Amino acid sequence: MKSKRDRGIDRREFIEISGKAGIGIGLSAVPLLTSSCTEVSTTKTVHGACYHDCPDRCSWKVTTVDDEVTAFQASEDNPYTAGKLCDKMVDFPNDVTFHPDRILTPLKRVGDKGQGAFEKISWEQAIREVAFKLQSIIDQKGGEAILPYSFGGNQGMVQGDAIPNRFFAHIGASQLERTICGSAAVAGVLATNGQTTGVLPEDIVHSRYIVLWGTNPMLSNQHLWPFIQKAKNQGAKIVVVDPFKSLTASEADWHIQPNPGTDTALALGLMHVILAEGLQDQDYIDRYTLGVDQLKEHVQKFDPESVARITGLEPETILEFAKAYAQSTPSLIRVLIGMEHQANGASAFRAVAMLPALTGAWRHFGGGLMHMTYELFGASLDWESISLPQVLANPQTRSINMIELGKALNDEALNPGIDALFVFNSNPAVTTPNQSAVLRGLQKKDLLTVVSEHFLTDTARYADYIFPATTVLENWDILDSWGSTYININEPAIAPLGASKPNSELFRLLAGEMGFTESYLFESDIDIVKKTLQSDHEYLKGITFESLRESGGQRLNLPEKWMPHAEGNFKTTSGKCHFYDAGIQPSLPTYIPVTYGKKDQEEYPLHLLTIKTPRYFLNSSHANVDHILEKEGKPYLEIHPSDAAARNIADGHEVKVFNQRGSVYLAARLSQKVTRGVVCMPQGYWLSQFRGGSSANALTTDLLTDMGRGGAIQETKVEITKV
C-alpha cells in the first residue's frame, strides 16, 4: 500500500488534519495535531514567502507536526504583509501542494499532442530519454535549436534563475527575451529617470495627491492598499487613471477614464497645461533636468482640446487634472505595469515619469513616482552568485522574444528551427499572445516539448515529457521583490510529495546524465542561497542567512527618509531627469496612434482589453481549483449597453468574439465599467473553461512595444456577434 507521502494528501485529508480552521488572513493558527499515544511528536515552524509574480512578496509561516502541515499563515514579522495573505494564497496548501490533481511522478506522452494522455515513468527513464534527445539535437543542429521558456510562475532566485539559466547557457541554447511583462515599463522610466526605484511603498502615507495610473492595487497589489487608505484618512485625494472602471477606480475620489492606448497623449497634455499655466517648479527644472525647452515646444500641439479628441476625455477634465496635480503637495504617481501593453507603452511611462520633475514633486517626502524596487536588491545582493555572468555570456547565442513564440515555433526560415521547447514556471498556451499560432506550434510532431509542472496545464497537455515540480512548501529559495523592500528566505516545510523535485534538481540531473562536470551546474540550493547573501552592501547590514531563517523576511537597511531625487541624482548619463534625449529615438515621448487597415477598422471596430479582473487567479495559476472557479464564475465579456444594443445582445447572451487571429465564445455582461467602443475580457482562465477551447489570447496581437520589446497585447481589435 502506498503511503500518503507517496501519493500526496488529498483535500479532505488535509482539511481534517488542519482541523478545518482558517488558514491565512486574519485567522489564528490551525490547531496542531494531538494524539493520545505516548510517542513524542516533532513540531517545527519555518518561514517562507510567496513565489508568484506579484509586487507584494508576502511572508508566511508554516507549522508542521511529524512532516504534516498543520498551520499556514501570514507572518506578522513583515510589516508590509502585516499578518495577512492575499485572497489568492490563503488556502495555498490545499489549492496547490495537496491538490488531488497534482502531478507527483514523471509522465511520458502516449496519445496525440494536446490530448493529455500520459503514462507514468521513473525519474531514471525520464532523465535518460530527455537527456539523450537534447544531446542528439545539440549534436545535429546545435544548442540554439533548444529554447527554454519560463517567466514569473516562480520568482525565486534559485528555482527560477540559478541552475536552470546555467544549464541552458552551458548547452548554448537560444536565449529567451523575457519581455511579456515589465520590459516596456522599465524602458520608459529608465529613459527619463535612469532608475525605476522612486518613492517606497510605505512612504505613500505621506502623499496628499495620489494618482494610480494604470494600476489596480485593490486586486493586484493588495498590501499597498492599506497604506493608500491611511493616506486618504489623512486627507489625501485618490485619483485613478484607467480605461476600465476597476475595483480600485470604484473606490477612488476621481476616476479618469481615457481611451485605451492614449496615456502618452494624456501625460503630454498635462505637461502642456502645467507649462502654459506656469505651474512648473522652474528652480527644480533648472537644477536637475535636461531638455525643458524641447519639451515646451513638443507639448504645444497637445493642448486640452487636441488631447480630448485623442483620449475621449473632456478638455475641462484635462485642465482640472493638470492643475490639481501640480498644485498639490506632496503629489505622487503610482505606476506599475498596466499601461505598458500598448504600442506606445514605453513612451507612456517615459512621459508620465516626467511629471514629478516638472512640478518638483521629488523635493517632498512622499512625492514623486512610485514604480519598482528590484534595483535595490540588484545593488545589494551578490547577483553574480546567481547569474555567473562568465557562464551566461558564453556562448553568445540568438535571442527569441517570448511574445513571438507562436511565430518562432512555426518559422520555417528560422535556422536552426526550434526542435525542443523546455517549459518551466510558465503556461504559454494560455498566457502568450497569438494563441492559435502557439498551439499550432505545440502540435508539431517533430517538436520535443518538456514541461516541469504541478498540474496538467494547457501547455503540459502538449508535452512529450512532464517532470513533477515541487511547490514552495517543499524547496529552498531566496526571494527579492519588485514591489516592496523586504527580502525573504524560503525554507522547505515538508519533504517533496511523491516523486516531485525542485527545478534546480531536475537540471542537475540532466547535466549529470549528459556528462557535464562543471561544478556550477551542481551547486546545492542552500549554498546558492547563502552565497547570494554574502555581500557587504549597506542595504544588507544585519541581514544574514541565519537572521532570515529566524524571521523569514527582513527589510533592506534603507535610510529612514528615502528621497532619491530631492536634489536630482538621477541615474541617467547626465545625472539629470531627461525630458529630451538625443540618444533615444524618438528624442521625446510621442503619441503615435496605431494605424489599422480600413478593412480591419470596419470589420473589427471594438477595442479589446484583456485585464486582471479575477480576484483569485494569479495569471493562470489557481484557475484549476474548484472552489476558486466557483467564486470567480465562468469567463465573461464586459460590453457597454449601447454596443450590445447595436448587436442585439442582451445580458447573459452567449457571444462570439472574433478577429483575424481567432475566436472566443463566452457570455456577455452589460457593463458601465467600459466606455463605448471598448470591451473587456478577463485573463487567466484555462482553455477548457471556454466553449471552443480558446481563451483571450486567441485574439491578442503579438505586436511589440515602441521600446523594451514588450507585448502590445492591448492593441487588439475585435467584433462580436450573438451566438
Where are the predicted features?
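Extended redox/cofactor-interaction regions of prokaryotic respiratory oxidoreductases
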Residues: 2, 161-229, 234-240, 248, ...
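N-terminal export/assembly segments and adjacent metallocofactor-ligating motifs
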Residues: 2-277, 306, 314, 424, ...
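Acidic/polar loop patches that form or flank catalytic/metal-binding clefts of enzymes
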Residues: 25, 70, 281-282, 318, ...
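N-terminal leader/propeptide and maturation segments of large enzyme subunits in energy/redox metabolism
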Residues: 109-120, 279-315, 494-566, 631, ...
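Flexible glycine/proline-enriched surface loops and loop-helix/loop-strand junctions
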Residues: 112, 210, 251-252, 302-305, ...
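Glycine-rich phosphate/diphosphate-binding loops that line cofactor/substrate pockets in enzymes
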Residues: 127-146, 200-208, 298, 319-332, ...
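Active-site phosphate/pyrophosphate-binding segments
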Residues: 270, 290-405
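Long, contiguous, secondary-structure-rich segments that constitute the structural scaffold
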Residues: 497, 502-551, 624-638, 643-723
